[in-house]
Amino acid sequence: MALILFKWFLISWASVLPLRQVPFDEVGKTAHPFYLAVTEINHNAAAKTLEISCKMFADDLESILEKNYRTTLDITTDKDKSQFDRLIPDYVSKHIALTVDGKPVKYNFIGFEYDKESVYAYFEAEQVAGVSKMDVNNSMLCDFQDEQINILHVTVNGKRKSNRLVCPASLSSFSF
């Protein structure tokens, strides 16, 4: 279901984004005409946690990890899973910072999933009893593409708020 919704979301965005002719990137992978990542942050009041998921195009994530960490990776096989388990949380922690009610929030890596063309990375922040205001600094993949668009969805007490950031913009504030 999530995959269907995400594809619907991508198709709707594709209709408003300027398309450019980019058939292949430098390593021969098929390029896509827009660069998008979606970060969902849900406050779980009962568990006093923030549940964070990041969805990115697999080839974009693979390319930026290869560039930044000077390695060769293949997300389509299990042979590099331990490298991804180490590199994904390191990269994300450098590109997503959370502040809740004026206090920095640290989060832990739960794991990741590869699904055809997407990677889902999961994180959790503990001991977050309530949220009145959340600031999110999200520069995910801005070091990969200048045209990167980061969509943020934050849900607190059943109320969902969203924002779209186009690099270099990276800061978004949510009040509940």
Question: Where are each of the predicted segments found?
Answer:
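N-terminal soluble domains immediately following signal/targeting peptides that reside
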Residues: 25-176
